[in-house]
Structure formats: structure tokens, C-alpha cells
From Swiss-Prot:
A Gene Ontology biological process term: L-leucine catabolic process
UniProt protein name: Methylcrotonoyl-CoA carboxylase beta chain, mitochondrial
Effect ascribed to mutating S173L: In MCC2D; severe form
Source domain of life: Eukaryota
Gene3D superfamilies with a match to the protein in the record: 2-enoyl-CoA Hydratase, Chain A, domain 1
Phylogenetic placement of the source organism: Eukaryota, Metazoa, Chordata, Craniata, Vertebrata
Keyword DNA-binding: no
Keyword field contains Signal: no
Assembly notes: Probably a dodecamer composed of six biotin-containing alpha subunits (MCCC1) and six beta (MCCC2) subunits.
Length: 563
């Protein structure tokens, strides 16, 4: 009956009551409209977005090959499973693996290709427990740590700490990449921080499990040594602070890697390792048993309802949004294709309407959604602040859908207090302790990025679509600002500034902003947690909210709001 009622209410029905009990019941009006699939605009949008999605999938498949066929063949010849095979054998059969930061290191080091940053990170279910998995890819530079490798691992550990996810380290690395050691070793957020994080998480009862499946040298030896429990593969895994060449150089002693730091030594004599494994398969089997013995049970601070598919196909997002950021679209149409039953209870629908706020569910989890439908005015910012406060009071996780050029500017709006109203929203988002997830579906510019929970505001996860752009402002806007400043300066100096001069000034600025605002530029530097196919959005968000709810929701305290 309810399914029939929901269909009858499509889209956003505002029918007159049929009787005194017309508004009773649990039904919520469905959101969204059926697009004209045959229209020229829809077809053009679909084609452009589909091309970006195809490019995304091609690049992901290339990254999955790691260091290439030769390196993979050498790895296999040593009796090892490939890193992705290790993960497949570790997680529960048929369960998804939410891979993070796939494009870390993409085109970052000029001619040095470091697919995935030489490490695979992501969330998978192991013996029924959602875990953060961090796996070195020894096919990429022997698993050596580049600066971006460290940054990617630190981000994975940050996610694990925020969401209380047990960490499983599949170790197979030669340690720091020495030619870039200055950017790997000495600073606060360099390699040493990974061990600091291990210690802190262990102290907070967030399990740290290491599986030594290859080399574990120098500082890397602390990964298993600092783990709560570890496993080592015989005649394959090694743990030592100094390898055979360094031992010989320092002491003159000649010793094999196995005798210096192999499974027999560490399981029978040193006590550094806890479990001895025959091979990779056996090690992963033992790891699943270790997780089973964590005695962990997920406790939720939210209500759960049965999951329902949206009423509209996910790939319609291609035709609705497209790749041209200058074309507007209603964010409600995006919401309709990611939430359960396409049902959305909008909050303050007629006030501050350039910001859409409301309640929905994704895979049964309650979510408060904040989505952009244009530039932010004072009314929009105050509405957003009010809604964030509501969600914090009710322990409802927040989802931010960013497509924002920023806050409104101009004398009229400054006089009305846009600065203090925008500050309210920024402060509310910063202080919110409920799980926050951000998805950039279009532009992410200027202070709008802050108000909509950009990276600096610690969302538990931040994803980006392949059409999106992130920058302090658009390239043309930046070029116009700098051209105006230059023109005024030349005028004060009594010099000419011709249209040709202006064009010559603007061209490299626009090009630079376009390059640096590209999602691949962002993802290469781990400014986000991954570029995702819009059609996969619902699944990615569902897995992310599920992971985030492993941690208890803390009480939110707000500071002073300037009234």
C-alpha cells in the first residue's frame, strides 16, 4: 500500500487532503522528476559525463596493474599473491571493498610513475568487522615509501581513528624511498607519524594488526613490532632494523635475510611475531581468525530502517548534471537518485532557497543533506546553520553536496551582514561532531568550500565527481581580478595596458587554474578520498556512512555566533 501511495505522490506532490486523516501515516513525498531522455541538452550532458566516466575507469584499471607486467611477474614468481589478491582473500566473500585515494601520486613526480602511491588503502569487512586495510604494493618501486605514500597511509589512519576501524597492515615494503628522504622522514606528518598513530590507536582500543608478507626493513620494522598482534610468512616475510648489507657494513657479519629476521627467528626466539604462516593464503586465514577474536560488536547511535532503491536509475545523473559547470541543475534531482525510495523531507523549503536542506535515508541510515542550488545568501547561510544544529542535536549524520561558487558579494549584501551569517555556517560545520561526508558534484570555490565542509573541516570522507572543480575561484574570475589590478597599476604609472596585454596576462592564469582545479590534480595530492563514478555514489556513500557509525557520536558544543 505504501509503495502505491509513494508513487501517487511523485513528484513532490502537494495534493489537497482527501479527508481528515489524509496526512496520517509514515509516507513521505517522493522527490525528483523524470527527465526528457531525448532532449538535446540531456543527450549532450550524458555524452560529456559518460566520456569523463569512461576516462576515469580506464585510469583506475591502469592503476590496478601496479608496477606493470614485468614487476607483477617477478612478484608472482616469488610465491606471493598480488596485493589486490591479498585483499580479495582477506575480506568476507562477496563483500565490497571501498578503495580510497586511488589516484594518489597520479602524474605527481614528473616521469616517475607511482600508481596508487605504491600502497592500497580502503575499508573492507573481515570476519564481519569493518576494517581499514593498508596494503603495500611491492610491484611499485619495491613498495618503497614516496612522500605521497606516507600521506595516503596517514589519511587512512586518520579515517580509521575517526571512525574506530581496526587497522590491518599487509606489509611488503623496502622502507623509505631514499632519493626523496627529505620529504619522507623528518617532519611531523612524515613516516614517523604512522607509528605514532599506531600507538595512539592501540591506546584507544582500536586494534592494530600486521601481516608481514615481504620485506619489513628499518623504520618499517616498527609496523609489526607496534601492532597488537602480528603474523609473518615463513621464508618470505622479514623484520629487521638493518638488512644484511647494512649489518655487514657496520659489523662485518654476513647473515642471510631469513636468519637475520625471518619467521623462525621472530616466532621462536625474539618474540617479535605472534603467528607463523606457511604462505600468503595461510597468513590471511590467520588474520581473519585474529579479527574474529577481537570480540568486537558494532553499536549504533542511530535508528535503522529497511533499505530501498531510489525510484530513478543512477546513470540519469550523467544527463542531469553533465560536464559543463556553467549549466545549472536542481540538486534535488541528484538527491532523488541516491536516497532510499527517492524520499526527502525538506527543511525550510521556501526560505534561503539557494541551499537545499532536509532529511532522508541512505541504505537505511538517517542522513541530513545540505546541497547547493546557487550562490549562498545570508538567508541560505542562516538556514544551513539552523539545519546543522538540528542534526547535531539529533545525532543525524550530515551529507554535503557541493556545487558552490561562494557567498554573495556586493555592498548591499555586506551591509546585510553576509560576512557574519557566512561565519555562522562555517562555525556550525566546523564544530559539528556528527559524522560528516562531503561530495563535490560541481564547483567548489572560495569560502563556499568552507561553509560546505571542505577538507579543512574534517569530513569523515570527501569524494569528488570527475566533472568537478576545486579552487579558490574560477580561472576566468582570477584572470579578471589580476587583469584589473594590473590595469589600475599601469594607469597609476602612466603606462598603457592594451587588450593584447590583457589577453597575454589572462591566458596562462586561466590555464593554471584549470589544471590545478582538476579533480585528478586534487586526488593526486590526497586532497580528497577518491574520484567516483556518479552512478556509484549511493553505494560509496552507504559504505562510508556505515563505516563512520562504528564510532560513537560525540556531543557537539558550539562557540559564539555573531548575531
Amino acid at each position: 500500500m505504501w509503495a502505491v501511495l509513494r508513487l501517487a505522490l511523485r513528484p513532490c506532490a502537494r495534493a489537497s487532503p482527501a479527508g481528515p486523516r489524509a496526512y496520517h501515516g509514515d509516507s513521505v513525498a517522493s522527490l525528483g522528476t523524470q527527465p526528457d531522455l531525448g532532449s538535446a541538452l540531456y543527450q549532450e550532458n550524458y555524452k560529456q559525463m559518460k566520456a569523463l566516466v569512461n576516462q576515469l575507469h580506464e585510469r583506475v584499471e591502469h592503476i590496478k596493474l601496479g608496477g606493470g607486467e614485468k614487476a607483477r611477474a617477478l612478484h608472482i614468481s616469488r610465491g606471493k599473491l598480488l596485493p589486490r589478491e591479498r585483499i580479495d582473500n582477506l575480506i568476507d566473500p562477496g563483500s565490497p571493498f571501498l578503495e580510497l585515494s586511488q589516484f594518489a601520486g597520479y602524474q605527481l613526480y614528473d616521469n616517475e610513475e607511482v600508481p596508487g602511491g605504491g600502497i592500497i588503502t580502503g575499508i573492507g569487512r573481515v570476519s564481519g568487522v569493518e576494517c581499514m586495510i593498508i596494503a603495500n604494493d611491492a610491484t611499485v618501486k619495491g613498495g618503497a615509501y614516496y612522500p605521497v605514500t606516507v600521506k595516503k597511509q596517514l589519511r587512512a589512519q586518520e579515517i580509521a581513528m575517526q571512525n574506530r576501524l581496526p587497522c590491518i597492515y599487509l606489509v611488503d615494503s623496502g622502507g623509505a624511498y631514499l632519493p626523496r628522504q627529505a620529504d619522507v622522514f623528518p617532519d611531523r606528518d612524515h613516516f614517523g607519524r604512522t607509528f605514532y598513530n599506531q600507538a595512539i590507536m592501540s591506546s584507544k582500543n582500536i586494534a592494530q594488526i600486521a601481516v608481514v608478507m615481504g620485506s619489513c626493513t628499518a623504520g618499517g620494522a616498527y609496523v609489526p613490532a607496534m601492532a597488537d598482534e602480528n603474523i609473518i610468512v615463513r621464508k618470505q616475510g622479514t623484520i629487521f632494523l638493518a638488512g644484511p648489507p647494512l649489518v655487514k657494513a657496520a659489523t662485518g657479519e654476513e647473515v642471510s635475510a631469513e636468519d637475520l629476521g625471518g619467521a623462525d627467528l621472530h616466532c621462536r626466539k625474539s618474540g617479535v611475531s605472534d603467528h607463523w604462516a606457511l604462505d600468503d593464503h595461510h597468513a590471511l586465514h590467520l588474520t581473519r581468525k585474529v579479527v574474529r577474536n577481537l570480540n568486537y560488536q558494532k553499536k549504533l547511535d542511530v535508528t535503522i530502517e529497511p533499505s530501498e532503491e531510489p525510484l530513478f536509475p543512477a546513470d540519469e545523473l550523467y544527463g542531469i548534471v553533465g560536464a559543463n559547470l556553467k549549466r545549472s541543475f536542481d540538486v534535488r534531482e541528484v538527491i532523488a537518485r541516491i536516497v532510499d525510495g527517492s524520499r526527502f523531507t525538506e527543511f525550510k523549503a521556501f526560505y534561503g532557497d539557494t541551499l537545499v536542506t532536509g532529511f532522508a535515508r541512505i541504505f537505511g541510515y538517517p542522513v541530513g543533506i545540505v546541497g547547493n542550488n546557487g550562490v549562498l545568501f545570508s538567508e541560505s547561510a542562516k538556514k544551513g546553520t539552523h539545519f546543522v544544529q538540528l542534526c547535531c542535536q539529533r545525532n543525524i549524520p550530515l551529507l554535503f553536496l557541493q556545487n558552490i561558487t561562494g557567498f554573495m558579494v556586493g555592498r548591499e549584501y555586506e551591509a546585510e551582514g553576509i560576512a557574519k551569517d557566512g561565519a555562522k555556517m562555517v562555525a556550525a560545520v566546523a564544530c559539528a561532531q556528527v559524522p560528516k561526508i562531503t561530495l563535490i558534484i560541481g564547483g567548489s570555490y572560495g569560502a563556499g568550500n568552507y561553509g560546505m565542509c571542505g577538507r579543512a573541516y574534517s569530513p569523515r570522507f570527501l569524494y569528488i565527481w570527475p566533472n568537478a572543480r576545486i579552487s579558490v575561484m574560477g580561472g576566468e574570475q582570477a584572470a579578471n581580478v589580476l587583469a584589473t589590478i594590473t590595469k589600475d597599476q599601469r594607469a597609476r604609472e602612466g603606462k598603457q595596458f592594451s587588450s593584447a596585454d590583457e589577453a597575454a596576462l589572462k591566458e596562462p592564469i586561466i590555464k593554471k587554474f584549470e589544471e590545478e582545479g582538476n579533480p585528478y590534480y586534487s586526488s593526486a595530492r590526497v586532497w580528497d578520498d577518491g574520484i567516483i563514478d556518479p552512478a556509484d555514489t549511493r553505494l560509496v556513500l552507504g559504505l562510508s556512512f556505515s563505516a563512520a557509525l562504528n564510532a560513537p557520536i560525540e556531543k557537539t558544543d558550539f562557540g559564539i555566533f555573531r548575531m
